[in-house]
Amino acid sequence: MLKDAHQKLIKHRQSTKLSMTDFACQAAPVKQPLPLELPLPLSVQLQLLAKTPTSDHAPMHSTPPTTPPTPPPLPLNMSQSASAVTEAATPENSLPATPPSEGALAVPSAPQDHYSLRWNNHQNHILRAFDALLKTKTLVDVTLVCAETSIRAHKMVLSACSPFFQRVFAETPCKHPVIVLKDFRGWVVQAIVDFMYRGEISVPQQRLQTLIQAGESLQVRGLVESSVPEHTPTPAASPDDFGMLDTSMLSSTFEDECPTMVRPSKGGKLLMPSARLFGNASSAIAALGLRRKREQESDRDLESDQELGGSSPMPRRKQARPRRRSGDVPHDFTLNKTDAESLQTVIKHELLERAERDQEEAPDQDNSQGEAEKISSSPAKTLVERAKEQKSMKEEGSDQPRSLNENHHQLELDDEDDDDQDHEEEEEQDIEELIHTTNELRRQAAAAAANAAAMSPNPSPCLSDGPEDLCTTKKGKELISGPSSSADCESNNNNSSKLQDNNQRIMLSLKDIRQLNANPNPTAIHTPTSCSGGNNGLLTFPPPGLRPPGLPDSPPCHMEALEAQMHAAAAAAVAAAGSGEHPFHHMEHQMEMSLAAAAAAAAMHQREPRDPRDGRDHNAFASNLLGPMGMPPFGGHNGGHPGNSGPGNGCPGQAAHERLEESMNRLSKELGKEFGKEFGKEFGKEFGPASPMSLQGPFNAPDGPPHPPSPLPFPGMSSAMTLTPPHMFGLDSPLGLFPPGIDPGKLYNPLMEMSDPRDMPGGPPPFLKKKMPRPKGQHSAPRGGPPRSWTNTELTEALQHVWNKKMTTSQASRIFGIPYNSLLMYVRGKYGKSLKLEQLRKDCISGPPIEMLQMGIGGGSGGSTKNEKSKERKEKEKDKNSMSSNGSGGSANSQGGAPTSGSGPMQHSGELGPMGQLDLDLGLPLGPPGGPRSNSSEPDLLSAPNALFNPFNPQGFYPDFSGGFPGLPLSMLNLLPPAERHHAAAAMHHLGVSMDEDCKSVGSKQSSSVDEDYSGPGIPLSLEHRREISATGPPLTPSNGGTGHD
């Protein structure tokens, strides 16, 4: 039974609502079945009860039992052990535990003891856990898309901190919503998200108004001036009720570990949280320790008078209603203006907090601009003195209320608005003076840097409340330069704000282009100071606030600006070499990506400024910048505009990109003299005109419109074909497919001598040219397709080689560049008579191949005799009912030679009608290849064991056979006279020799025309002459009633 009771205690040990008395009651029946005394099981229970809080739950608060149990020694031991646990687990600055509920005390049997389990650092843990989940993007389920970036977050946290997000998520129940905040900049959304997750952020004063306006638009609790209700809505409320919520969703017990943005201290001061996102890390740690000390002291005073409920011990400050109403469209993200009171209270404390942290420094600069400026020491001293005076005014009443209780705090809350009104006018005056002083100092620095005596700066600040023009107004705190040392402020906030300011720069700086094209860099990027005369003489273009008033705010990115930046980069390299550093790194810092925009800016060099005075001011300003470095000014020595090519121009007829190229070459030579040849080569390789970064297109017509600039960071005006040599992708190259026995040098291809029209210099761009026919590669049939892309010469040579059996069709197709299907149609005779190929075909087929002539087989000469002619006529009259066709047996001297004689028709009997094509069994082309060919007909020409005209097997020719016999090979039938061939064919037919099915329809048009052309009288021939004729040029084979296929 003791084991059972022990297991039950272990099972329910982590319960927070069940009392220990219940466990004792469950274990109480142990004493009845055991024959032991009463104190033994009770002592066991006492050990279990006393051990449980100390061993397993060390950080616990335990309240002593109100009523002792029935045995008298039990309450003493229990209370002692419980009090020991309380002393061990309770820190000094913690709050007392929550009292037991009334429902638990209403047990009818006996009063029960309740143990309150408390997680001391629960709120800190929750905040850190949510922040860690946000940083690692774990379990994120919503994406906030702003003007230039996107931020992922958790719907639960956003809904808990903003009724606006709560209403949006309730009305659009999707798994991962994407909320587009197009009117908000990236740093604003990131700061609001960090404020909701961490409870505090640090904001520069010039950005404070924008942040509060965005917080009011998004109804962020802690940023919006609204009253928080005492009761939270139930989860059973309908989604329509969420629209009525202007206030807090949870009245949680946020205590000393989660301060709001602006909270009252005991002295009535407004305590701004320390710098965590925007400020210095060292000052943030010191301010955080000071704030925690103050909160611990206030908590000690509040601990005695605090109520025992679950509400927050911190008094809530008075707030006003938000701007947004429940009837507004939830996706209307227009910014609302804030009240002057809330803005002044926050700015007032911001001045005081900065004066406490930085006694010897001026306020921080705006990190998002990336612009560094130096200021003289006297204005900084005046700012510090003014901040000290404000601190002394604030600290007059700070020592009085150290021992005030909660009632005094309530009185201070009532007088908070009165204090704000008292200091409102004074602080407003200070802020305006600060802005005036800042603008005056910045304009003086610009005038000193530009050496523009005629352009006197006018310190007339332009105040604006809009969030978009922070780059030009309200820069009261942006004075002292220095690289930022914060670890987490450069990642999203500054990166996003730099993207907005790009359109107001006079040029594309390196930092902006890097952050446009790369991932955000968490480390601070060092940018050298500008226009101050220091920093080793490095001069860059000033930020928008430092420009002379005559210059436009957003001029186009001209080539002149890039050229000036190149000169400035050269000066940076000289200064770096003088200080002992490697000069190329500074050159790369200044010019790495600026030349990438050269291609886009080259097209803009012909564009005139709208106001001629703007161009003159721009050139004067740039010439003043380049004057100390000994560089030539932009507009030439005569002061002419660089876009004009006339007598007033210093470089007539020279475009801006040409001057840039010359300047690059000159800089490369000068740097080679200054730092050695290796550095000059390195500079020329990286930034020279031949590098891909500065490559200009090979076409820029002076009379035509310029090529539009490419939005890419590399030049988009050069085609890939213009960069490729023509021999790399020549479509007319045979690609190494020559047969082994053919010399490629003997083949004439006129297209190989043509130059590639795509590589012609000085022509229009490739995409503006008219579409030219490609030299090769048109896969088209002779009829019914697009125009053929080969010449008649190529086709004639290809057909001549194929018909003479020097090549196969596939070899000729690859060598001569004619598609295989088209060439095959020509080889088979399916072409029109307009190509004049009939004579070539007759010559090639009737004459022997060149190899046969080299073997000693000459072409015979002579015509048909009258006897032969009369004999052939008689045979023709006998077989006029049979299915036959006439052919020609004229001979030729060589390929392409004219036939000198014709042969009469070949007689066949009627029973030889289906056997008229036996001589084509092995693929020997004795007739015109006009009919369909089998797929294996060309290999049969070379692979037949006894092929007669096989050039690779000369042993297959037997010229001594004079007669035919039944066992004669089919190809040898061609050597017999027509009369003897008839008997041999009949004999083979009776022996069962079959024909090739592919050769049954080989008749063509040329058979009848040859009979008509060569039917004239001739010289009588003997049997030997007829054999030579048949051996030299086999006559056309009669077809089985087939007709020519056109």
UniProtKB/Swiss-Prot annotation:
Domain HTH psq-type: 781-833
Ranges of compositional bias, category Acidic residues: 413-432
UniProt xrefs under CDD domains: BTB_POZ_BAB-like
Swiss-Prot/TrEMBL GO biological process terms: gravitaxis; larval feeding behavior; larval walking behavior; male courtship behavior; negative gravitaxis; oogenesis; regulation of transcription by RNA polymerase II; ventral midline development
Cell location: Nucleus
Domain of life according to the entry: Eukaryota
Protein's name according to its UniProt entry: Protein jim lovell
